[in-house]
């Protein structure tokens, strides 16, 4: 049958393996030239050794400091081979840094605990808190490091050193495999050319074999004296402030008049500079819903879901015209359903709800200088107003059913408040953009409701949340600031705004083609598709549209074969012993599907739909053609059910349930999952083209014979086609639902 097309693509894929397309060889070869960026890529700090002006080679030496490390344990064995400097960026508040020792205090075991103390605070040891000793607390008169420790006859002692540096720490010197020396010194200033890290030291044994060092905050490691580097890091480097005037913002948000737009160069050397940007922005949120109509008699709607929206707009910032691009997406949406079970009952299979604690993500990018070279960024801050949606005509939709007043789905009020700002990357039809993601949380809604007609008619359902919007746009304003590491020479840029890849271009072509493809797929006659599905389709049938493609048949075949190798269907078929039956994955892992002259399976329908539609579209691009073939194999008819027949018992499994029933009486029986899994690996698995509910409805309505029931259970193609030709509404509705899932 038609699915033999996929079998041929699998069995003859050797053709593309030995026939690589020349264009691939031209476009896939990459030569990488790069500059060693020093330890910035490791430590999120400036490069280790600065250059001295214009030079013609790398200005950076081997990294001396690594980090920040976030692991919670340092193994003892990693500290006994060489001197190790354990460094911390000065915390904002008092915090526990590390501890070596058992989980609870034991006077017979040596231990130590390191804290950072903020000036004006009292620090109390966690490890030693259970003992009665005044040394377990410390009143900090200045920023400091405090080492609480016990060893031998010393019940509890503490060592305190000043911590005035931006980055500082302690020195750990190994003695042998079971002992090490902790060294500390007051870090007050950088007046000297060198620094003695060992003004105070104490030798500690290991508490117990197997006890390591617990870390409670991120840290850096150095294997050689980092004093010179830390001294250079400490020097003030503010050099240039570029200030621009900004228009006054007349808005009801909490931001008031807003700050001046500032670009502040805070550090600079031969190749790199750190620039702090502060900008006011105008943010737009566009919420758009997508409505999918089901098959049948016109009363069935499959879903109403919120779409991920790409939206562009322009505004003026400090006299400069700014072109902005945002991507709006959603998280933690709720799902609702509505409707009855009869074919003429209006129903919505699923509609999304934005309710309290749902999230709206807005990824923002504009064409101003702040997003040029936006690769390494730190200290991202934002102060953004919220969004308010109130009822409008764009927040109602009327379902055009065949008979009666059109039911309406309505939304009321929605309030979004700003939650936080993150770095992100958004993908458009043409480019990938490094962006700022603004996270908004839903804090209140006035509810959704369904009416029998216009908004003033009777309500038939209601609930909390925001259910529908037809592209309504809301505005807010705010400020953003961040520090970006960029080249000192402004001519260097990263390919962000102008990037365009083959894959993105292909996605754009697919998007342009999607509506036409889906419209043709919806208009096809059921009997035509079933007749085509019952015919022995081959690769030559697929290439009937090749004359419209500006490539040779040989190149088209190679492209299709190569693309097909990436599909899940091909990868699973390549595993000869693959018999895994995964219930939670919509049964996609069933490979031993029944094959005989009369039995119809899902691949028969999907390949017939793909061949029919592509031939009618007359596609002129070989990449798009290959992409559609591969997508049809994996994505068409995602909602699949399978069954097996054992004597007079049918075992059936769907995406939502599993059950067994008698083939004559259709009475359900207990389902044995172990037995079913064993049968799935040994017996042919039948695609449930006509589902159990439809078979039962046909028997109850028309009183068909046991022989016809058996043929429907076995997905007998001639029997199904005869019901279609007789215009049986139940069978037509079922097949229409399957065909409606054959969409790009």
Curated annotation (Swiss-Prot):
Family per similarity comment: Belongs to the rotavirus VP4 family.
Region named Hydrophobic: 396-413
GO cellular component, one term: host cell rough endoplasmic reticulum
Taxonomic lineage: Viruses, Riboviria, Orthornavirae, Duplornaviricota, Resentoviricetes
Site (Cleavage): 231-232, 247-248
Pfam annotation, one family: VP4_helical
Protein name, as recorded: Outer capsid protein VP4
Coiled coil: 503-523
Any one Gene Ontology BP term: virion attachment to host cell
Superkingdom, taxonomy of origin: Viruses
Record's keyword terms, sorted: Capsid protein, Coiled coil, Hemagglutinin, Host cell membrane, Host endoplasmic reticulum, Host membrane, Host-virus interaction, Membrane, Outer capsid protein, Viral attachment to host cell, Viral penetration into host cytoplasm, Viral penetration via permeabilization of host membrane, Virion, Virus entry into host cell
HAMAP family in UniProt: Rota_VP4 (MF_04125)
């Amino acid at each position: 049958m038609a699915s033999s097309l996929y079998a041929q693509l699998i069995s003859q894929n050797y053709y593309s393996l030995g026939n690589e397309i020349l264009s691939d060889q031209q476009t896939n070869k990459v030569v990488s030239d790069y500059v060693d960026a020093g330890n910035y890529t490791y430590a999120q700090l400036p490069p280790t050794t600065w250059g001295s002006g214009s030079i013609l080679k790398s200005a950076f030496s081997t990294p001396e400091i690594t980090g920040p490390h976030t692991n919670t344990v340092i193994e003892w064995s990693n500290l006994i081979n060489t001197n190790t400097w354990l460094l911390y960026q000065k915390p904002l508040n008092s915090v526990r840094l590390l501890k070596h020792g058992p989980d609870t205090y034991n006077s017979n075991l040596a231990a130590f605990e390191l804290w950072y103390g903020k000036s004006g605070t009292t620090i109390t040891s966690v490890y030693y808190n259970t003992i009665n000793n005044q040394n377990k607390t410390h009143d900090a008169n200045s920023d400091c490091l405090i080492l609480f420790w016990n060893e031998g006859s010393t019940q509890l002692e503490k060592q305190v050193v000043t911590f005035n540096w931006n980055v500082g720490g302690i020195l750990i010197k190994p003695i042998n495999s079971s002992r090490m020396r902790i060294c500390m010194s007051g870090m007050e200033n950088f007046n000297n050319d060198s620094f003695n890290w060992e003004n105070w030291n104490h030798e500690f044994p290991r508490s117990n074999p197997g006890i390591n060092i617990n870390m409670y905050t991120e840290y850096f490691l150095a294997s050689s004296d980092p004093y010179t580097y830390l001294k250079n890091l400490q020097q003030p480097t503010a050099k240039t402030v570029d200030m621009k005037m900004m228009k006054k913002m007349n808005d009801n948000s909490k931001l008031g008049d807003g700050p001046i737009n500032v670009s502040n160069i805070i550090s600079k050397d031969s190749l790199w500079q750190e620039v702090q940007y502060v900008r006011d922005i105008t943010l737009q949120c566009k919420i758009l819903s997508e409505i999918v109509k089901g098959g049948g008699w016109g009363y069935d709607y499959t879903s109403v879901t919120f779409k991920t929206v790409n939206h562009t707009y322009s505004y003026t910032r400090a006299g400069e015209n700014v072109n902005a691009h945002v991507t709006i997406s959603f998280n933690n949406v709720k799902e609702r359903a509505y409707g009855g079970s009869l074919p003429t009952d209006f129903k919505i299979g699923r509609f999304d709800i934005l309710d309290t604690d749902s999230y709206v993500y807005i990824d923002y990018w504009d064409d101003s200088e702040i997003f040029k070279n936006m690769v390494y960024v730190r200290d991202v801050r934002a102060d953004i107003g919220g969004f308010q949606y109130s009822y409008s005509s764009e927040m109602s939709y009327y379902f055009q059913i065949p008979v009666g007043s059109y039911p309406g789905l309505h939304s009321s009020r929605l309030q979004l408040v700003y939650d936080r700002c993150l770095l992100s990357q958004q993908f458009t039809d043409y480019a990938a953009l490094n962006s700022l993601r603004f996270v908004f949380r839903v804090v209140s809604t006035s509810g959704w409701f369904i009416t029998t007609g216009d908004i003033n008619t009777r309500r038939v359902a209601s609930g909390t949340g925001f259910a529908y919007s037809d592209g309504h746009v809301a505005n807010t304003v705010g400020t953003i600031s961040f520090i970006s590491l960029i080249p000192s020479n402004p001519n260097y840029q990263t390919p962000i705004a102008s990037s365009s890849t083959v894959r993105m271009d292909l996605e754009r072509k697919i998007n342009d083609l999607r509506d036409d493809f889906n419209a043709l797929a919806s208009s096809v006659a059921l009997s035509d598709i079933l007749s085509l599905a019952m015919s022995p389709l081959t690769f030559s049938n697929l290439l009937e549209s090749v004359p419209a493609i500006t490539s040779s048949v040989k190149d088209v075949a190679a492209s299709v074969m190569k693309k097909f190798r990436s599909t899940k269907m091909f990868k699973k078929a390549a595993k000869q012993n693959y018999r895994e039956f995964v219930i939670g994955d919509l049964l996609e892992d069933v490979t031993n599907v029944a094959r005989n002259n009369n039995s119809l399976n899902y691949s028969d329908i999907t390949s017939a739909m793909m061949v029919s539609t592509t031939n009618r579209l007359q596609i002129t691009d070989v990449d798009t053609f290959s992409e559609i073939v591969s997508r049809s194999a994996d994505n068409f008819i995602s909602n699949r059910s399978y069954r097996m027949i054992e004597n007079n018992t049918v075992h059936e499994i769907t995406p939502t349930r599993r059950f067994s029933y008698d083939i004559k009486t259709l009475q359900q029986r207990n389902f044995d999952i172990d037995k079913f899994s064993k049968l799935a690996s040994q017996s042919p698995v039948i695609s449930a083209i006509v589902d159990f509910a439809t078979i039962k409805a046909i028997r109850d309505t028309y009183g068909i014979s046991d022989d016809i029931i058996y043929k429907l259970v076995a997905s007998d193609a001639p029997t199904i086609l005869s019901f279609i030709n007789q215009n049986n509404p139940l069978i037509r509705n079922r097949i229409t639902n399957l065909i409606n899932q054959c969409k790009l």
